[in-house]
């Protein structure tokens, strides 16, 4: 087998390799407990533990339960997230964009035609490098009307500059929601956690979650502000290598966001977007390792299926 083929095979481990890797990583440094929940419920639970600033949303099947569960837990005093119900998904995405530009941590959830209604907003959010997290419970795009699960909606996001993490069970929905925000703030890009509508969004499984919200918040880390004289550009890396973020509400550091661009600025913007995507390839394995040391659950880029005897994948 050539070096290229070998590296390709290693990049796409088999299901058996993935399972053995996960089982081998038994060291768990954080207390956890069992929950019997669906993907939607665990997406909401992860958001509750993160304690986002804002969720701009508009309900649509099969992702409606995410906002519903967050609203219920908020009524119980379990988080401080401000849920803002918009008049439609386009407006919900605008709420998220404005809140992120204002320095907030932002969360959203949608599906199918709701995603398409908001589609215009997504390249703007990535192109102006606003970190946020959106869950997509994947569903058939209507035409004719259908609410069954497929990937016809998420495919529209492929060229919008968003990172997409696909979760194939409720446990991964929980884990990826925690990893997604940290990744978003590492590379200054918005991240989608996508999962199958009804199959993953509604079916319940036994899952492990961190016992304390503080564990999650320590893993995510604080969102660093740019109230620092050494920081002179949007999302400039500081001496520690951590991203710091401007806020349009920070009057001490005024900044214009989304201003008009011609060549060569627009070309440079797209190249910077490409570099951020490439940086994701480096950051994501590091975050997987960090998360595994905390949870005992190891994730990889891809899972192979019947790849054991393949020469090329």
Where do the model's predicted regions map?
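Flexible, glycine/proline-enriched loop segments at strand-loop-helix junctions
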Residues: 160-172, 189, 274
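A cross-taxon signal for low-complexity, glycine/charged-rich
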Residues: 7-9, 15-24, 224-227, 236
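Conformationally flexible catalytic loops at phosphate/diphosphate-handling active centers
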Residues: 191-304
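Thiamine diphosphate
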Residues: 2-3, 23-156, 161, 178, ...
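Conserved anion/nucleotide-ligand pocket segment
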Residues: 171-205
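Short basic, glycine-rich beta-strand/loop surfaces that mediate nucleic-acid
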Residues: 127, 180, 207-209
């Amino acid at each position: 087998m050539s070096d290229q083929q070998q590296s390709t095979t290693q990049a796409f481990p088999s299901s058996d390799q993935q399972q053995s890797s996960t089982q081998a990583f038994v060291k768990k440094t954080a207390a956890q407990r069992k929950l019997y929940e669906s993907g939607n419920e665990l997406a909401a639970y992860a958001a509750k533990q993160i304690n986002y600033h804002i969720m701009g949303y508009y309900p649509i099947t099969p992702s409606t339960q995410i906002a519903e569960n967050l609203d219920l837990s908020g009524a119980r005093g379990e988080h401080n997230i401000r849920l803002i119900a918009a008049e439609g998904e386009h407006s919900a995405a605008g709420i998220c964009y404005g809140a992120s530009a204002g320095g907030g941590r932002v969360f959203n959830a949608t599906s199918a035609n709701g995603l398409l209604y908001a589609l215009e907003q997504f390249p703007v959010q990535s192109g102006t490098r606003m970190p946020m997290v959106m869950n997509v419970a994947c569903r058939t795009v209507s035409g004719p009307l259908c609410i069954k699960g497929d990937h016809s909606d998420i495919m529209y996001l492929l060229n919008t500059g968003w990172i997409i993490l696909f979760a194939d069970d409720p446990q991964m929905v929980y884990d990826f929601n925690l990893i997604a925000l940290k990744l978003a703030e590492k590379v200054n890009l918005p991240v989608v956690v996508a999962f199958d509508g009804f199959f993953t969004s509604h079916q319940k499984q036994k899952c492990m979650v961190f016992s304390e919200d503080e564990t999650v918040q320590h893993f995510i880390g604080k969102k660093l502000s740019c109230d620092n004289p050494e920081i002179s550009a949007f999302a400039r890396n500081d001496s520690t290598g951590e991203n710091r973020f401007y806020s349009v509400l920070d009057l001490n550091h005024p900044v214009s966001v989304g201003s008009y661009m011609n060549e060569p600025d627009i070309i440079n913007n797209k190249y910077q977007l490409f570099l951020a995507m490439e940086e994701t390839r480096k950051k994501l394995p590091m975050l997987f390792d960090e998360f595994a040391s905390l949870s005992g659950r190891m994730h990889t880029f891809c899972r192979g299926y019947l790849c054991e005897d393949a020469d090329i994948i």
